[in-house]
Amino acid sequence: MAPPSRRECPFPSRRFPGLLLAALVLLRSSCSDACGPPPTFEAMELTSKPKPYYKVGEQVEYDCKKGYHHFAPFLTHSICDRNHTWLPISDEPCVKKVCHYIPNPLHGEAILANGSYSFGNQLHFICNDGYYLIGKEILYCELKGSDAVWSGRPPICQKIVCKPPPKINNGKHTFSDVEVFEYLDAVTYSCDPAPGPDPFSLIGESTIYCRDNSLWSDDAPECKVVKCRFPVIENGKQIAGFGKKFYYKATVIFERDKGFHIIGSDTIVCNSNSTWDPPVPKCAKELPPSSTKPPTLSHSVSTSPTTVSPTSSVSGPRPTYKPPVSRYPGYPNPDEGMLNSLDEWAIALIVIAILVGVAIISFGLHRYLQRRKKKGTYLTDETHREVNFTSL
């Protein structure tokens, strides 16, 4: 049997590199003679699927994108030029579609977010004082198919009104015959005269008004008798808020006596449940300042075993010697001030004694000299004679 014949490759291996090089040269020459992908725009797009390369002289068509329309006639195609660039065109004639104009609502205002009615923009609505908005506060310009439309109906501004305020027991409010209250209308409550000795107190806000949400600014107040007990404080006294009876919001201020301090608040107020808030304070006695207690010293006498100590008939602990506090280091000596004052007096007495002694000695010398001068000459009318005498 003859062996199978070997099949030869139509492209010998030695020729393959040459063929590959030729293909690259042809591809390079074809790419250099073509344009790349055509330009893209915000407002318009190609009417056909784009290709990676276009021959010289080849043309592409454009049209406005969805949501845009032709504002004016314009060039809608571009051509691959000989210099391998696209003929310049613009998308400015394609403009956004707009929603229809919405005027300001009665007693309100419509505000464009970006100053335009084109799709994608917003329209905000607000109402004047005394009116509230019924409907959507913001409308959006959206695309519906090929048209631009608003996302809803425009709202309206309705006048703010409140229902009559609630009635209260033991009291009344002004304008009780009015059925509808407008924005910022106000009523004032008051209490009726009480049948007993104590009057009614108005608990809460006396005046309320109609707010922008058609509700009253506060709950209705309450009329009831509020009376707190007479406040009594030991070791202290009342200095403000005197009275025989204490009704709602009565305020009392206390002061402590000397040697005491207040526990609690010195100011209390009668609240709506007839109790003092905070509670009536108390006065506690002030404690003396703490001092360090000196150590106690005790002296004991030891005796020999043969010495028998006498037995005392008095029972109890043995007396111990405690030196005064002034003998410990760091404690002042109570006699120190007395000694200082005595030293001053002693010095003064010594000085006075010296002065008195000097005066006595001076006086004695003076008397002695006077006696010596009395020994002199005695003259008479008849004769002159010298007489020596001694004064007695």
Curated annotation (Swiss-Prot):
One GO BP annotation of this record: single fertilization
PTM characteristics: N-glycosylated. Probably less N-glycosylated in testis.
Domain Sushi: 33-96, 97-159, 160-225, 226-285
Any one GO CC term of the record: cell surface
Segments on the Extracellular side according to the record's topology features: 33-344
Tissue: Present in blood, liver, lung and testes. Isoform 2, but not isoforms 1 or 3, is present at the erythrocyte membrane (at protein level). Whereas isoforms 2/3 are ubiquitous, isoform 1 is expressed only in testes, brain and heart.
Subcellular locations according to the entry: Cytoplasmic vesicle, Secretory vesicle, Acrosome inner membrane
Pfam family, one: Sushi
Keywords recorded for this protein, A-Z: Complement pathway, Cytoplasmic vesicle, Disulfide bond, Fertilization, Glycoprotein, Immunity, Innate immunity, Membrane, Phosphoprotein, Repeat, Signal, Sushi, Transmembrane, Transmembrane helix
Membrane association type: Single-pass type I membrane protein
Domain of life: Eukaryota
Biased composition (Low complexity): 287-319
Record field: transmembrane: 345-365
SUPFAM superfamilies: Complement control module/SCR domain
UniProt domain comment: Sushi domains 3 and 4 are the most important for interaction with C3b and C4b.
The protein's assembly and partners: Interacts with C3b. Interacts with C4b. Interacts with moesin/MSN.
Entry protein name: Membrane cofactor protein
Species lineage: Eukaryota, Metazoa, Chordata, Craniata, Vertebrata
